[in-house]
């Protein structure tokens, strides 16, 4: 059984036991979280979401991605601006797909 659900502005296709990385969620490690914006379960398609369907997940890790560097350079003036950014994420393990 698979499901497609929405977190923030992104959609994820998952099965039970899958590990996904989503935008930062305000939950502690070990807590469970459930998402109700389920777009599709197997052959059932929602309009836009399926009522009474949830995807349950367990928070495995809160972390930050690898640092990316932004460099802005202006020619002729020897000016250079460097900036770094690390995007926070939440690592989730799918524990169940529930349809009532």
From Swiss-Prot:
Protein family membership: Belongs to the bacterial ribosomal protein bL21 family.
Subunit description: Part of the 50S ribosomal subunit. Contacts protein L20.
Signal peptide residues on this chain, from the entry's feature table: none
A single BP term in Gene Ontology: translation
Keyword Ribonucleoprotein: yes
Designated gene of the protein: rplU
One GO cellular component term: cytoplasm
Top-level division of the source organism's lineage: Bacteria
Source organism (scientific name): Malacoplasma penetrans (strain HF-2)
NCBIfam families linked: L21 (TIGR00061)
Keywords recorded for this protein, A-Z: Ribonucleoprotein, Ribosomal protein, RNA-binding, rRNA-binding
UniProt function note: This protein binds to 23S rRNA in the presence of protein L20.
Protein name, per record: Large ribosomal subunit protein bL21
Keyword RNA-binding: yes
UniProt-recorded Gene Ontology molecular function terms: rRNA binding; structural constituent of ribosome
Pfam families on file: Ribosomal_L21p
